[in-house]
Amino acid sequence: MAANRAPENPYLAARQEWTERYGSYVRAAAAWRTVGILGLAMAVIGFGYAMYLSTEVKLVPYIVQVDKLGTSVTTGFPEQIEYADVRVVRATLGNFVTSFRSITPDAAVQKQYIDRTYVLLRTSDPSTEKINAWFRGNSPFEKAKTATVAIEVNNIVALSNQTYQIDWTEYERDRKGKEIGTRRFRGIATVTLTAPQDEATIRLNPIGLYVRDFDWTAQL
């Protein structure tokens, strides 16, 4: 004899089937929403990173050499300048001392000298504070009212790949051109090379040389 079993309720069975189907739809929709949100987040991150890279463009100088007729004869990228290339460093340091110490009655030219001095200085380096202090106590514009100073760089010697000794002579004249004094100075400059990162820096400081520290004294 077959065991007694309660007859199935068709309404309950239909309700259970509906619940199972609807629940699977809900779970599938939730999964797709999660995938969509993750995809949108990745797209936003990728777009933001692309925008960041677009603002970080690094300019590299490209040299084109021409002959007397203006015809291109050689092209290419300049070689990376290392500390061993003392000729370039010497020339740059000679210009630095000349710009820093020269005094002229032409205010526009004097400002150019000062600007050229600060092109090789960074705000975080000790040399900047020392030269700031010098200019605060020795205004070249005030000095130019009574005298001018011309600079002759006598010698630049590499003490290491980062430190150089600079000897120079200063010729002071009154506003009539009469020489009123000659003094010799010696400076010790510590330099560093940093690759230029933008067009403005390339124009002003193409090799990326900065004077990290600078001390100078008068010689007897």
Curated annotation (Swiss-Prot):
Give a Gene Ontology cellular component term annotated to this protein: plasma membrane
Its main subcellular localisation, reduced to a broad class, is: membrane
Q: Where are the transmembrane segments?
A: 35-55
Instruction: State the InterPro entries in the record.
Output: NTF2-like_dom_sf (IPR032710), TrbF (IPR035658), VirB8 (IPR007430)
The record ties this protein, via SUPFAM superfamilies, to: NTF2-like
Enumerate the subcellular locations listed in this protein's record, separating them with semicolons.
Answer: Cell membrane
Q: Print the keywords alphabetically.
A: Cell membrane, Conjugation, Membrane, Plasmid, Transmembrane, Transmembrane helix
Q: How does it sit in the membrane?
A: Single-pass membrane protein
Assigned protein family: Belongs to the TrbF family.
Query: By its UniProt entry, which NCBIfam families does this protein fall under?
Result: PRK13836.1
- Official protein name in the record: Probable conjugal transfer protein TrbF
Record the organism: Sinorhizobium fredii (strain NBRC 101917 / NGR234)
